[in-house]
Amino acid sequence: QRAKLWNKNTIPPHVLVMTATPIPRTLAMTVYGDLDVSVIDELPPGRKPVKTFHFTDAKRLKVFAFMKDQIKKGRQIYVVYPLINESQKLDLKDLMDGYESIAREFPLPDYAISIVHGQMKPEAKDYEMQRFVKKETQILVATTVIEVGVDIPNASVMIIENAERFGLSQLHQLRPRAWADEQG
């Protein structure tokens, strides 16, 4: 489609390419001078910046206390894992063990937890996501299957286990899933 426009005109059109997470090809084009770069370095009016913290496993109880405080304020929480099941080769937290740990710390009937991962049938994933969207659950334990197409303003906290196992683009894609709401 762009090629037709270029061939149709004697003066080449200006092309504006926008991305929040550049793919390697786009990044290479900017590095090697094939694209001019404009930077939007401020947030839209009224949007609070996303706060990022790093905690080691030794601070897990502090993280759980923070989660409980956020849930008391009516907020929802994402907890993202790099693996669904335990790996024989990698020493990482996995979703299934993480879910069990969270379920012990956040028991029914006071708390409800959804679980979503790529090995689930689409109907089961949709059901669990809808429970989270409808605020029937306060915590969504998931893999990066939530990376695309999930925008729940009430879910203002995201915990990413073993964040070093994710690529920078993946982390950048996940970040907006947890927006800071107006209450701070």
Which residues does each PLM region occupy?
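Inter-lobe coupling/hinge segments of SF2-like helicase ATPases
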Residues: 1-184
